[in-house]
Amino acid sequence: MKLCLGCMEQMEDSVTTCPHCGFNEATFTQESYYLTPGTIVGGKYILGKVVKYGGYTVTYIGMDAEKNQKVMIKEYLPSEFSTRSAGEKEVTIYSGDALELFNQGLTTFLNEANRIQHLEDPKGIAKVYDCVAENDTGY
């Protein structure tokens, strides 16, 4: 069995197109500055395809390999301050003012995620299970 990187459901090893969502890894394409499906962050989160890009974050479908639980993983990746080379994990931060603005935004992103993670009952807010600083950015 293998994991479909489009929906994080299990499927037979011999199957190329997911019977659950129609995702086909062989024909799938995405922007080169997104992380490649199958990338692991935080030592346990398997990233799938991008489900949303907005403003300063990229949202990937993912799987917590330790808990065998589907998750959504947000990555701080503001296009006006940073990029990523195809096939690389690390973010390239532009120089000058962009560097300072990127770092301020990253600090805010991680602090906010950390605060939400520790809320007892985050009504109307998606539950945050973990915060990871890796690849010169945050998740």
Predicted regions and their residues:
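Short cysteine-rich clusters marking metal-coordination/redox-active sites
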Residues: 4-7, 18-21
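Cys/His-rich microdomains that often coordinate metals
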Residues: 10-11, 25
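A short, low-complexity linker immediately N-terminal to eukaryotic Hanks-type protein kinase catalytic domains
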Residues: 28-47
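Protein kinase glycine-rich loop
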Residues: 47-55, 59
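Flexible N-lobe loop architecture of eukaryotic-like protein kinase catalytic domains
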Residues: 52, 111, 120-124
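Conserved N-lobe loop of protein kinases adjacent to the ATP-binding glycine-rich P-loop
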Residues: 62-71, 76-83
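AlphaC helix of the eukaryotic protein kinase fold
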Residues: 83-119
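Short beta-strand micro-motifs within the conserved protein kinase catalytic domain, predominantly
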Residues: 127-138
